[in-house]
Structures are given as C-alpha cells and as structure tokens.
Amino acid sequence: MAVFTAVSDSDLAQWMRHYELGDVLAFRGIPSGIENSNFFLTTTRGEYVLTIFEKLTAEQLPFYLDLMRHLASHGVPVPDPIPRDDGALFGLLHGKPAAIVTKLDGAAELAPGIEHCIEVGQMLARLHLAGRDYARYQPNLRSLPWWQENVPAIVPFVSDAQRALLEGELAHQAAFFASDDYAALPSGPCHCDLFRDNVLFAHAAPGTGHDVRLGGFFDFYFAGCDKWLFDVAVTVNDWCVDLATGVLDVARADALLRAYQTVRPFTAAERRHWSDMLRAGAYRFWVSRLYDFYLPRAAEMLKPHDPGHFERILRERIAHTPALPETHTACN
C-alpha cells in the first residue's frame, strides 16, 4: 500500500473518464504498506480507494475483485469494486492493472480488546462459509512454494541462528503440508492478511448492547484459496499478541476463537494441528518481511515492517501454543 507509481492530475483526469463517479474533490496517496499503490479518492458521488497493482497481473486480478463482489453479495462487509463504463472491474493505468473500490466506514483499531476480537472472529468464519460456492480458484501466492523459492535469497543476510530457524521451520512446514491431516483440513477462499490495519470499526448504533460495530474487512489482494485454519492463525497472530514480545494474549485469542466457532466449529484435524498452523502463519510473514527488508523495491513512500516481530512470534509459537477452545454450537 505504499505509492510505487505516481499519478498526476492529468493521469487521474484521463482515468476518471471511464467512470461515472462525478467530479474529483480530493486525491492523496496512502503511505502504509508495501505491496500496491493506493490512493484515497473523494468525488461528488462519494469516497473510494484507487489501487494500482504492482505485482498482480491482469490474469490474476479477477479472482480478487470477483471475490470481493461475491462476499459482498453474501453479506460480508468488504469494499465493492466499481465497474468502468465498459463493465470491467479494472483497467490499465501506467500499463499496470488498476481498480476503484468503495471506501468502508470506520477506523482501524490498533489496540483491540475482547469485543473487537469477538467481532473479527465471527465475521472471519462467515467470510469462510460465504466463499464456499465461489467459482474462481487462486492459490495463496505466499504459501509453501513461495517460501521454498525465496528463503535461499534471504539467508545470506541473516545470522546463523536465524538461518537455522528459517531452514528448520521450512523443513517442518514442508512435512506438515505433505501430510494426510493437512490435506483433510477444510479449505476455501481466505483473506490471508487480516491484520488490525485491514479491519475497520465504527460506533455501534444505540440500543444494540455493543460498543463497537465491525465496519468491514479490506485489502484482499493477498487473498487466496488455502486452509481456513491458516487464515485463523494469521489473524490470531496479529490480533491476539503482545506487540513487544509476540506472546499470545490468551484472553483475546480465546474470545476470537470461541466467536469463530459459534459460526463454524473446528474439526478434529484442525485441533491437532493448531500449533503447526500458528507457526505457518508466523513463518509466512517473517519470510516476506525479511525479503522486503533486505531486497526492497524502489518506492516513493516505503515503510518496511520490522522482520523481528514475526521472528519473535514464531519462536513463541514453537515454544508454547494453547489448545483451541472447546467447540460451541454453530449458528448461521
């Protein structure tokens, strides 16, 4: 979400001719993140986000945009892609795929409490179930094959201890992914990047009995078809940790996981491999952050994340992982 590709006023004016969104009132780059170029766009018709996709190809993009439309049609609050005048959900800007989506209400909660975790857990389970009949398929592009391809490029930059952990965990995950239990885990479209800054909350309406309302999930451009438990693990590793140490906050994790399984109970195989999947979720982001830190791309506004954060989380998950909470009756 850093700005890698600049958009001038004349570029924007030409681009907006393909949309019926009124006159542009404001336009500014979003500096956070490291993958795509994102801009807040305000017009006389409303508020939107313009994204230029720096890595995803025109062949890959329909999976993500159509998934967002599919989830929205099933009641999951996500950004809605805006069709162009030819009906397409994206076009080319500076030779790169680009799209406009609706901007969700609310703000990110960077210090979540129990109620935030409950809201996220329930909606993540609803997202998984809503995606069961989604017709397109795209694997998680940052899964085991990506790790195997890119870890060798990273190891020259790290310490001996880090190299041992990188290579040892890669071997552990490769064996896990090859197991019959892994093959049996429930799967489908996953967000794969449901961090605190990819969820918005708004104030709940009076009389609802809640202090917060989930405004929506966004930034689906790491989404892919994967094991649902991986998506849960990625989410817990961000929403339910002490950011300074990586230690799991058991109360928040318990709240999120219990809320999730009121919608979709965990299977026996998922319970057996919760620790493995928490490790996989931590490893995925440690590897990608190491790659972005040591092998960055040029960008106008680039703020690489600290790789050490997910190294600490991975070491913590290897040392200790509580069991999944007991199953509750599902409700849809």
UniProtKB/Swiss-Prot annotation:
Pathway: Amino-acid biosynthesis; L-threonine biosynthesis; L-threonine from L-aspartate: step 4/5. Its EC number is 2.7.1.39. It comes from the Bacteria. GO terms for molecular function: ATP binding; homoserine kinase activity. One of its GO terms (biological process) is threonine biosynthetic process. Keywords: Amino-acid biosynthesis, ATP-binding, Kinase, Nucleotide-binding, Threonine biosynthesis, Transferase. It catalyses: L-homoserine + ATP = O-phospho-L-homoserine + ADP + H(+). InterPro entries: Aminoglycoside_PTrfase, Homoserine_kinase_II, Kinase-like_dom_sf, Pseudomonas-type_ThrB. HAMAP family: Homoser_kinase_2. NCBIfam families: PRK05231.1, thrB_alt. Belongs to the pseudomonas-type ThrB family. This is Homoserine kinase. It comes from Burkholderia ambifaria (strain MC40-6).
